[in-house]
C-alpha cells in the first residue's frame, strides 16, 4: 500500500509551518515518494509529523522503526532551511545519524540497495517510489556494474554522498592495508559532512587505529565542538 497523498501533504504543511519552507510541487512529490518507500520497507510504521515524543526539535518525524523505537525523520537545521536531510533519531531523541542529504538521494539509495540485496528479484521499493525512482534509476544498472564496483563505490559515484558508504570505503582501504587511500577518503568524508559529530568520531577512531594519536585527539575534540 502506498502512502496517501494526504499524508505527504500533512508532512509538507508541517515543514512549511515549522521552518518557513515554501511547499512546492517538487517538495510534495519527493516527500510523497519518501513516505511510500518507507511504508514499503519491513519493520517501519509511518507516523504523523506532530508525534514528537522523544524526537529532536529540528526533526520532523516520518516513520518509526518498530524493533528499535528509533525514528526516521527529516532534519531541518536552523542555519540551512533549504536542507531537508534524512536522519535516524535515537530512541531517547538526543542523537542523530545522517542517512542521506535529501529525500531523492535516500530514495535512490534504497532502490539500489534493494537490487543489490535481492539480485533484482525484489522491486517493492522501486515500485513504491513512483516517478521519483524511475527518473533517478535505470533498473539493473548496479547489477551490470557490480563486477567492477562495490556497492559503496557505486552509491558514492552514481547516487550521492552517504556517511555509511564513505565509512565503508575507508574500512575497505584499511582492510587492504592502503593507509594513504583511507586517509584521503577520511578527508572527503570530513569535507562533505563537516557539521556532523559522528564523522569526527569515526575519523578519530581511524587515526587511533593507525597509532596517530595526536591527530586522533584533534578530530575527537573537533567532534564535540
Regions found by a protein language model. Give the residues of each.
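Acidic-enriched, low-complexity/disordered segments with a strong bias for Aspartate over Glutamate
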Residues: 13, 79-82, 119, 127, ...
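Alpha-helical segment of the N-proximal tetratricopeptide repeat
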Residues: 131-192, 202
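Alpha-helical repeat scaffolds
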Residues: 182-189, 214-224
Amino acid at each position: 500500500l502506498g502512502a496517501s497523498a494526504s499524508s505527504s501533504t500533512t508532512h509538507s504543511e508541517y515543514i512549511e509551518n515549522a521552518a518557513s519552507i515554501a511547499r512546492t510541487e517538487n517538495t510534495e512529490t519527493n516527500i510523497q515518494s519518501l513516505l511510500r518507500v518507507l511504508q514499503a520497507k519491513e519493520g517501519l510504521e509511518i507516523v504523523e509529523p506532530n508525534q514528537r515524543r522523544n524526537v529532536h526539535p529540528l526533526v520532523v518525524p516520518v516513520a518509526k522503526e518498530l524493533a528499535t523505537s528509533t525514528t526516521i525523520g527529516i532534519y531541518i537545521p536552523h542555519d540551512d532551511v533549504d536542507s531537508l536531510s534524512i536522519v535516524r533519531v535515537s530512541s531517547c531523541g538526543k542523537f542523530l545519524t545522517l542517512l542521506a542529504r535529501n529525500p531523492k538521494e535516500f530514495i535512490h539509495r534504497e532502490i539500489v540497495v534493494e537490487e543489490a540485496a535481492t539480485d533484482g528479484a525484489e522491486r517493492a521499493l522501486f515500485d513504491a517510489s513512483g516517478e521519483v525512482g524511475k527518473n533517478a534509476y535505470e533498473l539493473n544498472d548496479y547489477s551490470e556494474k557490480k563486477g567492477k564496483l562495490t556497492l559503496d563505490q557505486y552509491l558514492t559515484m552514481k547516487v550521492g554522498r552517504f556517511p555509511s558508504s564513505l565509512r565503508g570505503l575507508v574500512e575497505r582501504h584499511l582492510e587492504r592495508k592502503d593507509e594513504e587511500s583511507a586517509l584521503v577518503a577520511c578527508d572527503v568524508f570530513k569535507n562533505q559532512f563537516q557539521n556532523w559529530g559522528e564523522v569526527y568520531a569515526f575519523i578519530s577512531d581511524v587515526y587511533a587505529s593507525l597509532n596517530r594519536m595526536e591527530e586522533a585527539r584533534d578530530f575527537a575534540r573537533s567532534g564535540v565542538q
